[in-house]
């Protein structure tokens, strides 16, 4: 294990002792202890909250080695001092590390340094130094990725604190909320928020079902903040309807009618519809009428339920027990998302049921809201933030879409999210329209939704792939300047579902917005990262939310790096940076000749290179069903490779030193095609034999992360180094040749005439090792993402015109 810990708050000795006293590790009876070993033994006893007898403690101490020759019990019997070797021998075992396997009893300090664990340098401790070392140990992450204080939490240490009076809750330790709330006593309510919408046109404002989990202490006056997850999947998914709506991608690319469109021609202009009157409450109450059993939860939310935060889930318009129609990303969906926040902050009404008009307020909420979630969930958090809604203090958006065009299209082409060939906005709407799963409701509402679905299918315009008003309405980047909430963005550099451009564009736009923003880039695909062993992500979010929602002064904004990136060359290695590419001035610039990428100052030959897109039918069918085989063959250099004549491949010289490629690679050149339409696709490749990180985090221990005491669990995971591979695709991009200048403007092209093109690839942050080669692949049909017409398209590129620009940072550590 290699520890990467960013959420530990630097603390002086006086503050540490005060905090230890607050959580009862230092108690008045310890004043009578006259020796440091006696104080140490008292601290050790408190670290075993599951043990209630002296004989039980002796048994536990007998299973811990203090030195290579003595158990902890034996050592305590004769100890006159506490030195750092014994302290960290014992401490490492309390943290779950094994002597002889994870560290050596003869030199625990070496392991502390190698694992990157914080420690005190004193060779021998007086009482004050012991307390400080113990405080630091409690805040040190163990082999299961949790701090020692979190480990004690899961074993019941904070159970006596459940009885604290409300004015002593929540309880913070080292700047983070602790689990002093009984999750067995959580209150579960259902309410129905009235949104300022009538999307199903039934003459009534849409009601939105909301599921609430809140601490029991709210019943006696404690007001708590909310973690709100807007999840269209929350009430169920109609997979069958989605599958039926999927589009055939084995269709030909066709010529578009040229146009003179400018952005003004496709800009979405919001309209104000006449709304039905709001419902009139007949009475008010503080008590919900409905409850629920097990919500579809996010484990990060589960963690905070034990720590003084309420959690709210809402699936929004078109979902079971709500009104409205699922619209996939439009303004109405944003409005429905924001309506929940407005109710939580007292600005909108909700009711205890769908028919009785009995109003209920969020009287238990302190008015501070954060939004959490990944993918569509994080997308709606981003959408809500761009409205500037009051009360939304922060969002933690993971793998979030910032523009739906960048999710389903690319430069005038239909480009699917990875593994979802044929999906589009209408498919997603059909899936999340869970009202269709309730027969009675579906009987009434299905005709209206079928009409809505037909509108989505028409307006998304798969025939052209162009950016239009439909997509402009679903572009949250237009309203980034309205954001008032502070933001943490999390994204996978290998996420080809929600591609990196989505987070990169949001991050770039936020540079001009006066909010605090943080960015975490990991090496995964479309995943959550709150269960990684090597990163204290959950503690980071605890630090952040304790500050943002409870107003705790814990230095969260300065302790967390602006940009935190997982290294792709080493396991369990993370680096902090001031920015992504925005502070970058260096770059690698290449021309091409024959099969090489050469430095831009080289003279290259005047010649053209050619490839054909059409494959033999049998091979085409094989690749459709074996996409990994297609990508592997695309990158093979062997002339017998079936794709050798179906793409161009250029490789740089070996890197003379490690290079950090960051930001947006850019390819320019000139191309001709034998038809009046065409497309180009591009990949950047890291060529070089190396052990690379696994595509997905591997389970290290199932259900090893306890999120509270007798509460929910999560698997402990992390990326590992896999077997050696010869190359890795690091980014890609696509271009419709009729959209060489703008995605909303289709230009005519003539067969066999060369046209200049210029295209940005997906942003990257990649460590290229010394001796590796950078590769550029130029091809047409992307079997994983574009439509696949398998047409007789012949492409020619002027090699002397091709340029590749890749921004880079100097590696300084």
UniProtKB/Swiss-Prot annotation:
UniProt keywords, alphabetically: Aminopeptidase, Cytoplasm, Hydrolase, Protease, Serine protease
Catalytic activity as recorded in UniProt: Hydrolyzes Xaa-Pro-|- bonds to release unblocked, N-terminal dipeptides from substrates including Ala-Pro-|-p-nitroanilide and (sequentially) Tyr-Pro-|-Phe-Pro-|-Gly-Pro-|-Ile
GO CC annotations on file: cytoplasm
SUPFAM superfamilies for this protein: alpha/beta-Hydrolases (SSF53474), Galactose-binding domain-like (SSF49785), X-Prolyl dipeptidyl aminopeptidase PepX, N-terminal domain (SSF81761)
An individual GO BP term: proteolysis
Top-rank EC class of the record's enzyme: hydrolase
EC number from the UniProt entry: 3.4.14.11
A Gene Ontology molecular function term of the record: dipeptidyl-peptidase activity
Annotated S-S bridges: none
Any Pfam family the entry gives: PepX_C
Active site positions, chain numbering: 375, 495, 526
Keyword Signal annotated: no
InterPro entries: AB_hydrolase_fold, Galactose-bd-like_sf, Pept_S15_Xpro, PepX_N_dom, PepX_N_dom_sf, Xaa-Pro-like_dom, Xaa-Pro_dipept_C
Compartments reported by the entry: Cytoplasm
Subunit structure as annotated in this protein's UniProt entry: Homodimer.
NCBIfam families from the UniProt entry: PRK05371.1-2 (NF003781)
Biological role: Removes N-terminal dipeptides sequentially from polypeptides having unsubstituted N-termini provided that the penultimate residue is proline.
Name of the featured protein: Xaa-Pro dipeptidyl-peptidase
């Amino acid at each position: 294990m290699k520890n990467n810990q960013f959420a530990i708050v630097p603390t002086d000795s006086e503050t540490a002792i005060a905090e230890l006293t607050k959580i009862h590790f230092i108690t008045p009876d310890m004043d009578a202890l006259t020796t440091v070993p006696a104080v140490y033994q008292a601290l050790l006893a408190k670290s075993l909250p599951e043990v209630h007898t002296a004989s039980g403690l002796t048994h536990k101490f007998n299973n811990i080695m203090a030195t290579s020759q003595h158990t902890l019990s034996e050592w305590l019997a004769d100890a006159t001092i506490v030195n750092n070797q014994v302290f960290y021998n014992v401490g490492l075992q309390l943290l779950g590390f094994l002597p002889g396997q994870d560290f050596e009893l003869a030199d625990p300090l070496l392991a502390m340094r190698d694992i990157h664990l914080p420690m005190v340098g004193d060779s021998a401790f007086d009482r004050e130094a012991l307390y400080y070392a113990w405080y630091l140990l409690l805040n040190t992450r163990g082999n299961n990725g949790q701090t020692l204080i979190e480990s004690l939490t899961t074993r019941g240490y904070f159970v006596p604190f459940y009885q604290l009076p409300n004015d002593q809750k929540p309880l913070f330790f080292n700047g983070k909320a602790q689990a002093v709330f009984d999750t067995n006593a959580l209150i579960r309510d259902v309410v129905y928020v009235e949104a300022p919408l009538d999307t199903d046109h039934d003459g009534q404002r849409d009601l939105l079902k909301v599921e609430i989990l809140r601490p029991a202490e709210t019943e006696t006056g404690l007001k708590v903040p909310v973690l709100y997850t807007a999840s269209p999947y929350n009430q169920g998914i109609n997979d069958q309807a989605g599958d039926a709506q999927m589009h055939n991608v084995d269709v030909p690319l066709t010529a578009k009618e040229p146009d003179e469109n400018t952005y003004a021609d496709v800009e979405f202009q919001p309209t104000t519809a006449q709304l039905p009157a709001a419902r009139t409450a007949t009475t008010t109450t503080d008590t919900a009428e409905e409850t629920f059993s097990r919500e579809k939860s996010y484990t990060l939310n589960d963690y905070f339920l034990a720590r003084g935060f309420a959690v709210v889930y809402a699936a929004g318009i078109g979902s079971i027990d709500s009104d409205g129609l699922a619209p996939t990303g439009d303004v109405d969906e944003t409005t429905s998302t924001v309506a929940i926040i407005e109710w939580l902050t007292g600005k909108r009404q909700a009711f205890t049921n769908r028919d009785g008009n009995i109003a209920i307020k969020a009287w238990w909420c302190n008015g501070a809201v954060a939004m959490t979630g990944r993918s569509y969930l994080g997308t709606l958090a981003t959408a809500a933030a761009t409205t500037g809604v009051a009360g939304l203090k922060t969002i933690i958006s993971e793998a979030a879409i910032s523009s739906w065009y960048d999710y389903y299209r690319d430069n005038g082409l239909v480009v699917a999210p990875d593994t979802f060939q044929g999906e589009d906005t209408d498919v997603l709407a059909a899936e999340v329209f869970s009202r269709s799963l309730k027969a009675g409701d579906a009987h009434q509402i299905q005709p209206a939704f079928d009409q809505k679905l037909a509108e989505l299918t028409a307006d998304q315009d798969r025939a052209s792939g162009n950016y239009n008003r439909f997509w402009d309405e679903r572009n949250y980047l237009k309203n980034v300047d309205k954001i008032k909430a502070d933001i943490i963005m999390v994204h996978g550099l290998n996420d080809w579902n929600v591609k990196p451009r989505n987070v990169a564009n949001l991050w770039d736009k936020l540079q001009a917005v006066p909010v605090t923003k943080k960015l975490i880039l990991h090496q995964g695909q479309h995943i959550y990262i709150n269960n990684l062993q090597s990163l204290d992500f959950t503690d980071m979010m605890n630090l952040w939310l304790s500050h943002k929602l409870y107003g705790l002064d814990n230095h969260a904004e300065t302790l967390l790096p602006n940009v935190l990136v997982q290294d792709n060359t080493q396991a369990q290695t993370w680096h902090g940076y001031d920015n992504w590419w925005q502070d970058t001035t260096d770059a690698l610039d290449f021309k091409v000749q024959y099969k090489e990428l050469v430095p831009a100052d080289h003279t290259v030959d005047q010649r053209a290179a050619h490839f054909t897109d059409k494959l033999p039918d049998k091979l085409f069918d094989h690749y459709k069903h074996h996409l990994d085989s297609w990508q592997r063959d695309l990158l093979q250099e062997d002339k017998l490779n079936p794709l050798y004549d179906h793409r161009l491949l250029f490789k740089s010289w070996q890197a003379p030193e490690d290079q950090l490629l960051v930001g947006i690679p850019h390819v320019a050149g000139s191309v001709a095609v034998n038809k009046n339409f065409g497309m180009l696709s591009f990949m950047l490749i890291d060529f070089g034999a190396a052990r690379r990180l696994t595509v997905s985090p591997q389970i290290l221990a199932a259900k090893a992360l306890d999120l509270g005491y007798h509460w929910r669990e999560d698997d402990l995971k992390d990326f590992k180094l896999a077997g050696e591979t010869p190359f890795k695709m690091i980014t890609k991009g696509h271009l419709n040749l009729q959209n060489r200048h703008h995605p909303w403007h289709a230009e005519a092209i003539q067969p066999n005439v060369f046209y200049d093109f210029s295209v940005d690839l997906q942003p990257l942050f990649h460590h290229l090792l010394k001796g590796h080669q950078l590769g550029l692949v130029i091809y047409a049909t992307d079997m994983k993402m574009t439509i696949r017409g398998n047409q007789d398209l012949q492409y020619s590129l002027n090699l002397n015109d091709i340029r590749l620009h890749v921004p880079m940072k100097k590696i300084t550590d």
